[in-house]
Amino acid sequence: MNTATLSTVSTVSAPSHTTSSALHRACVAAKVAADNKGRDILVLDMRSCTPLYDYFVISTGSSRRQIHTVAEESDAAMRAEGDTRMGIEGYEASKWVVQDYGDVVVHVFDPDTRDYYKLEELWSDAPRVDWEREI
């Protein structure tokens, strides 16, 4: 291994702010969906199902505008909790918006797409979190 290469490698410092727990942030995202009239809101505890993420937040919006609002307001709430979105998919099409926060993934569906993919059935082994009680 070339030691010159090693000396040019830089490290990224951890953020100076403190993020709240993944469970708390997932519940905050669920509450934001509810506050913006999202329907059929679920928080799934994914820790026993996959090592990739801890929680899924799943909700349904009835229109493109509502789907965008839930996604945008969820992102603002996650930022307020000290989190940074790592990626987003599906915003333009507005059928299924996926926001990746590393340990929390927020899914906002239109009704037909949610019915087609049935994530809660696909991940039926994941325990459901009583997010309203947790908040």
Regions found by a protein language model. Name each.
Residues 1-48, 64-72, 76, 89-91, ...:
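Long, contiguous binding/interaction regions
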Residues 53-55:
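Short amphipathic alpha-helical segments
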Residues 58-61:
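Short hydrophobic/aromatic beta-strand micro-patches
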Residues 80-88:
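Active-site phosphate-binding and catalytic loops of NTP-dependent enzymes
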Residues 99-101:
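Active-site beta-strand termini and strand-to-loop segments that position acidic
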